[in-house]
């Protein structure tokens, strides 16, 4: 438990800072652009991380939203209940996960449709010989063809959105103080460490996507959708009274409760 507490202390001192929340979006944009320049001008040699079957991609990135929801759900529930003691406020804050799920579903469906309507089936990866008889990506692949369309980077979108959402929700730790004897101490500490490491994985794999995969425009659009999903909620809608609200993070609990009143 001591090692876990040290990790939690380190993460509180890094990811929970307001400067991190303020600068992380710009850092992700800069990393995406820099990685894309490297990919275009001086491609890195093939490595384990450039293989789509690597462990982080298969077991984490492809399940990124599931991982994020599974860890944020108990974290939001425990920390917000610890601070407010009101089930109604906890449920209201948990609705952020429903909003995030809707954003994830709508964006991924949109990306899939864009790739479908802008794509064609080819005989080879070199885009030779259009196979007009195959009108969908699934049918094209089933018949051994290669589908090529405008493939907005789903990884760039989702990893951006998940990382920013976690950092926003962890801001509540400015107010959460539990000593070792508190019945929620172990659970919250464990969740802080898990969410912290998950955030580092998302940022690292975002960098790998920038360096190894997709064209610049595909990554720009993917990152842009992730930023819009984050800013449209935490930067705009959640500031309104009719919304899930922001995590409690004001100087006094009274002010925090007033913030969540309808």
Curated annotation (Swiss-Prot):
Active site (record annotation): 155, 214
Known role: Fatty acyl-coenzyme A (CoA) diphosphatase that hydrolyzes fatty acyl-CoA to yield acyl-4'-phosphopantetheine and adenosine 3',5'-bisphosphate. Preferentially hydrolyzes unsaturated long-chain acyl-CoA substrates such as oleoyl-CoA/(9Z)-octadecenoyl-CoA and arachidonoyl-CoA/(5Z,8Z,11Z,14Z)-eicosatetraenoyl-CoA in the endoplasmic reticulum (ER) lumen. This catalytic activity is required for maintaining ER structure and for lipid droplets (LDs) biogenesis, which are lipid storage organelles involved in maintaining lipid and energy homeostasis.
UniProt catalytic activity: an acyl-CoA + H2O = an acyl-4'-phosphopantetheine + adenosine 3',5'-bisphosphate + 2 H(+); (9Z)-octadecenoyl-CoA + H2O = S-(9Z-octadecenoyl)-4'-phosphopantetheine + adenosine 3',5'-bisphosphate + 2 H(+); (5Z,8Z,11Z,14Z)-eicosatetraenoyl-CoA + H2O = S-(5Z,8Z,11Z,14Z-eicosatetraenoyl)-4'-phosphopantetheine + adenosine 3',5'-bisphosphate + 2 H(+); hexadecanoyl-CoA + H2O = S-hexadecanoyl-4'-phosphopantetheine + adenosine 3',5'-bisphosphate + 2 H(+)
Disulfide bonds: none
GO MF annotation list: coenzyme A diphosphatase activity; diacylglycerol binding; triglyceride binding
Cytoplasmic side of membrane: 1-23, 79-93, 167-190, 240-262
EC numbers on record: 3.6.1.-
Enzyme class: hydrolase
Chief location bin: endoplasmic reticulum
GO terms for biological process, alphabetical: cytoskeleton organization; fat cell differentiation; fatty-acyl-CoA catabolic process; intracellular triglyceride homeostasis; lipid droplet formation; lipid droplet organization; lipid homeostasis; regulation of cell morphogenesis
UniProt xrefs under PANTHER family: ACYL-COENZYME A DIPHOSPHATASE FITM2
Free-text tissue specificity from the UniProt record: Widely expressed, with highest levels in white and brown adipose tissues (at protein level). In the heart, mRNA expression levels do not correlate well with protein levels, suggesting post-transcriptional regulation in this organ.
Species per Swiss-Prot/TrEMBL record: Mus musculus
Cellular component aspect of the GO annotation: endoplasmic reticulum membrane; mitochondrion
Record key words, sorted: Endoplasmic reticulum, Hydrolase, Lipid metabolism, Membrane, Transmembrane, Transmembrane helix
Consequence recorded when altering residue 80 to A: Decreased specific binding to triglyceride. Decreased lipid droplet size. No change in protein expression levels and subcellular localization to the ER
Membrane topology type: Multi-pass membrane protein
Transmembrane annotation, as ranges: 24-44, 58-78, 94-114, 146-166, 191-211, 219-239
Family affiliation: Belongs to the FIT family.
Localization of this protein: Endoplasmic reticulum membrane
Lumenal side: 45-57, 115-145, 212-218
Protein name: Acyl-coenzyme A diphosphatase FITM2
Description of the deletion phenotype: Homozygous knockout mice display embryonic lethality. Heterozygous knockout mice exhibit shortened left ventricular end-diastolic dimension and shortened left ventricular end-systolic dimension. They also exhibit improved profiles upon pressure overload-induced heart failure.
Lineage: Eukaryota, Metazoa, Chordata, Craniata, Vertebrata
């Amino acid at each position: 438990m001591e090692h876990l507490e040290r990790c939690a202390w380190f993460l509180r001192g890094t990811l929970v800072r307001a400067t991190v929340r303020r600068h992380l979006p710009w850092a992700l944009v800069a990393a995406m652009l820099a990685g894309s320049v490297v990919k275009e001008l001086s491609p890195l040699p093939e490595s384990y991380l450039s293989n789509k079957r690597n462990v982080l991609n298969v077991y984490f990135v492809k399940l990124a939203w599931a991982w994020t929801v599974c860890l944020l759900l108990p974290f939001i529930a425990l920390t917000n209940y610890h601070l407010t003691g009101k089930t109604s406020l906890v449920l209201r804050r948990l609705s952020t996960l429903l909003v995030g799920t809707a954003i994830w579903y709508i964006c991924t469906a949109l990306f899939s449709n864009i790739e479908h309507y802008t794509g064609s089936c080819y005989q080879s990866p070199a885009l030779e010989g259009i196979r007009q008889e195959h009108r969908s990506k699934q049918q094209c692949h089933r018949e051994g063809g290669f589908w090529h369309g405008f493939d907005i980077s789903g990884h760039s979108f989702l990893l951006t959105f998940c990382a920013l959402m976690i950092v926003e929700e962890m801001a509540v730790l400015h107010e959460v103080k539990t000593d070792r004897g508190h019945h929620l101490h172990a659970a919250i500490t464990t969740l802080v460490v898990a969410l912290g490491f998950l955030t580092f994985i998302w940022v690292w794999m975002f960098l790998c996507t920038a360096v190894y995969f997709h064209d610049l425009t595909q990554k720009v659009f993917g990152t842009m959708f992730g930023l819009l999903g984050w800013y449209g909620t935490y930067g705009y809608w959640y500031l309104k009274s009719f919304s899930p609200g922001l995590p409690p993070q004001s100087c006094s609990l009274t002010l925090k409760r007033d913030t969540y009143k309808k």
